[in-house]
Amino acid sequence: MSAEAKMTTSTATQAGAEALERLRQWPGEHRVAVGLSGGVDSSLTAALMVEAGWEVEGLTLWLMSGKGACCAEGLVDAAGICQQLGVPHHVVDSRDTFVREIVQGLVDGYRAGITPLPCSKCNRSVKFGPMLAWAEQERNLPRIATGHYARIRLDREDGRWKLLRGLDRRKDQSYFLYDLPQEVLARVVFPLGELTKADTRLEAGRHGLRTADKPESQDLCLADHHGSMRAFLDAYIPPRDGEIVLQDGTVVGQHDGIEHFTIGQRKGLGIAWSEPLHVVKLDAAMNQVVVATRAEAGRTGCEVGAMNWVSIAPPPLDSPMEVEVQVRYRSEPVRAHLICIEATANDRAKERPHRCKLTFQEPQFSITPGQGAVLYDGEVVLGGGLIDSPV
């Protein structure tokens, strides 16, 4: 049965109508594999592309056994959406890849005292690249589409594809997409990039999609899968008690594992002090959580490794730039001075020959090794990398 036959109302919202027109005008072949998680965003992505006249096939990556998105529940909902839209549905078992690339990386990172950013790595290593390869090799489909809230534009002056923030700043997911290469941007479509979440719900209802009212996941998929992030970490990392210390080494408390803490954390320290203390460092070698007052916790800059320049060519070494940088998903971008520096041996071993040094216009709180430092010029994502060496 067609998507039109399943609609509960016949008229698209203004945002939906504009999304349909963009899809109809999209350059190149209109044949696509839509990544379906079983949630409302990817469901509407498929429905809009069918309505816009694209040849659509659904593709679900099976990432974990158990309940939730990426698991059995997500597979069932994704299959149901494809049946409702009258399009084929395919499942690719990616569980081994997910464990190797994401689960093990998370465990290793937390053991080393960093707070990893698994979503950006998952997007590059588990989702987008493998999905494109599958679409081309198995189904001869030239494009993929996902339900991410981000936008893509072709700059006809330099011939590069630009990654832009999603129109809905509360749902914008460009922070997690900075690591995509140009060859992926050239072949991916984000139909929801100029919709708000409210628009998505309305359009999903218009199409009568079974996922229209499905609740959103509120946490990292692994945390949802295990019940909490602590439960996930406890399943992989044996507890190891240690000291909580001030920056001068004074012992002020005890902890049950550095993996349960992150930079900037104040609650849950179990310390009575004259003023609130925040985590400023996780010392894996000493198995210590280092704390300080907020006034002492500001950082003037950091180095950023494993850089990917997504929308522009890599700048030359020692060339300065003024940028906006976002250092956590929910944080606001801040002004910073950037200079490209020599890559480390570790960067080069990971085939990432680019590194930069950031100096913030004003000292920043919660600069967290392992998190992304994503660089923006207004709405355009210039690139990004992983924070290390805060100063």
UniProtKB/Swiss-Prot annotation:
Which InterPro entries does its entry note? MnmA-like, MnmA-like_C, MnmA-like_central, MnmA-like_central_sf, Rossmann-like_a/b/a_fold
Per the record, its GO cellular-component terms are: cytoplasm
Is Zinc among the key words of this record? no
Q: What does this protein do?
A: Catalyzes the 2-thiolation of uridine at the wobble position (U34) of tRNA, leading to the formation of s(2)U34.
- What SUPFAM superfamilies does UniProt report for this protein, alphabetically? Adenine nucleotide alpha hydrolases-like
Q: Which residues bind ATP per the record? A: G35, L36, S37, G38, G39, V40, D41, S42, L61, G147
Q: Where in the cell is it found?
A: Cytoplasm
Q: Which cystines does this chain contain?
A: C122-C221
Q: Provide the GO biological process annotations.
A: tRNA wobble position uridine thiolation
Keywords attached to this Swiss-Prot or TrEMBL record, sorted alphabetically, are: ATP-binding, Cytoplasm, Disulfide bond, Nucleotide-binding, RNA-binding, Transferase, tRNA processing, tRNA-binding
This protein is called what? tRNA-specific 2-thiouridylase MnmA
